[in-house]
């Protein structure tokens, strides 16, 4: 008997009929003798609906008190879907109980709307499992040291599921979604994209950080830190599919690099539309400038991605970096109001119409020429590269967003990713 964690996304929970199918699938696993913990997302569109109501009431509000109420509001979406799934399981003859994050409890810090999990108390869940119940834990949320409900940010249910799996020392965490695994790139952009049977943890971490929507990056970080066995598979296969066939479907996230994986120089093309570029011009070229700029941004809980500092000329330089597009206006205001006056820079400019395109592959460690091949391919399509970022197993470029799909298709073809 294994302890298995299932996570279901919003599309998988998108209607009562789909919730019923999820219940049948979970019941099948439980009847096969497994202890089952399920982490569902809110029903598709529900979180956006709830946050939209808040925006109607306070369009421009952005402070801690407001963010606290947003978390109270948004958390109800997962609470509703969890209770509905428990009811559906009970209708299938399965003993089941649902818990909100604060009831478990899943303990987080106090960063409302972007909280991070600090610990999970597994006593209550283990007691229910020992009694033969299926336990449903709300994704996306927890409770801070002061008893306030917090949410983990977009995609937080993935993180919840992997964190629960880590805390429970689960045998496997299965992430059910609306796609049947991890692909070489988004099939909606490149129809020839292939599903990967396995992908290394490092590659998945890079893909998640670079914009792949299959898994949320913090969930992959958790999986890597605690060595949680993880698989991505489709919730739209028939619920009564043979359980052994289902257990081997989708894409396995592996922590071992086998020979076949070594042979692939590039495993996938990732892209992210949600980027914005900010440039601080005419910055005095002296020690501490990077900290003055990025320290203030970090203090505002804004994540920075690609960073470039130009060569100095006449004692001045330009400093550019990218942030999430949702943080663009806030970052611009912060720099203009609090940083620019004390910095001695000439101005701050921004561009929210950019995107990031990346090639990823563990084979890049031991093969040269992948970056130049990428640059040549983009050049042949007339695509200008604005910024470049590299690591051992990825190369990313920032380009005009209107060329994103062209760039992805060109790179997918250049690296022969349509061929097995």
Predicted regions and their residues:
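Nucleotide/pyrophosphate-binding catalytic subdomain
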Residues: 1-220, 310, 399-400, 415, ...
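Conserved dinucleotide-binding and phosphotransfer motif residues
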Residues: 32, 92, 226, 300, ...
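Terminal amphipathic helices with adjacent charged low-complexity linkers/tails
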Residues: 40-51, 183, 232-258, 315-316, ...
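Glycine-rich beta-alpha junction loops
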Residues: 43, 179-181, 226-230, 234-239, ...
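Short hydrophobic alpha-helical runs that function as membrane-insertion/retention elements
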Residues: 172-176, 230-232, 305
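Acidic-aromatic/histidine active-site loop/patch
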Residues: 223
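A conserved regulatory-domain signal marking ACT and ACT-like small-molecule sensing domains
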Residues: 243-420
């Amino acid at each position: 008997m294994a302890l298995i964690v299932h996570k279901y996304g919003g599309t998988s929970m998108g209607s009562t009929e789909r919730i019923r199918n999820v219940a049948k699938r979970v019941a099948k696993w439980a009847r096969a003798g497994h202890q089952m913990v399920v982490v569902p997302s809110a029903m598709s569109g529900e979180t956006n609906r709830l946050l939209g109501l808040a925006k109607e009431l306070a369009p421009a509000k952005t402070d801690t008190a407001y963010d606290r109420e947003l978390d109270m509001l948004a958390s109800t979406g997962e609470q509703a879907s969890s209770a509905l799934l428990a009811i559906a399981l009970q209708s299938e003859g399965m003993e089941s109980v649902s818990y909100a994050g604060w009831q478990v409890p899943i303990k987080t810090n106090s960063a409302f709307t972007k909280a991070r999990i600090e610990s999970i108390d597994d006593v209550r869940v283990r007691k229910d499992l020992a009694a033969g119940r299926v336990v449903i834990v709300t994704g996306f949320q927890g409770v801070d040291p002061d008893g306030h409900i917090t949410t983990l940010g977009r995609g937080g249910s993935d993180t919840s599921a992997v964190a629960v799996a880590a805390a429970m020392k689960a045998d496997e965490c299965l992430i059910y979604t609306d796609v049947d695994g991890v692909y070489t790139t988004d099939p909606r952009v490149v129809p020839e994209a292939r599903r990967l049977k396995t992908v290394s943890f490092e590659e998945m971490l890079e893909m998640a950080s670079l914009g792949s929507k299959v898994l949320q990056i913090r969930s992959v970080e958790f999986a890597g830190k605690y060595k949680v066995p993880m698989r991505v598979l489709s919730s739209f296969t028939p619920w009564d599919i043979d359980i052994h066939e289902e257990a081997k479907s989708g894409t396995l996230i592996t922590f071992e690099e086998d020979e076949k994986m070594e042979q692939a120089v590039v495993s996938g093309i990732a892209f992210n539309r949600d980027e914005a570029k900010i440039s601080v011009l005419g910055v005095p070229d002296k020690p501490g400038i990077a900290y003055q700029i990025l320290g203030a941004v970090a203090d505002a809980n804004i994540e920075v991605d690609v960073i470039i500092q130009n060569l100095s000329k006449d004692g001045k330089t330009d400093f550019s970096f990218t942030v999430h597009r949702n943080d663009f206006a806030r970052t611009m205001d912060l720099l203009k109001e609090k940083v620019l006056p004390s910095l001695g820079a000439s101005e701050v400019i921004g561009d929210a119409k950019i995107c990031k395109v990346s090639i990823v592959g563990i084979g890049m460690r031991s093969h040269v020429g992948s970056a130049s091949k990428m640059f040549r391919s983009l050049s042949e399509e007339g695509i200008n590269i604005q910024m470049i970022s590299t690591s051992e197993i990825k190369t990313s470029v920032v380009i005009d967003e209107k060329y994103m799909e062209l760039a992805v298709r060109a790179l997918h073809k250049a690296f022969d990713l349509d061929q097995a």
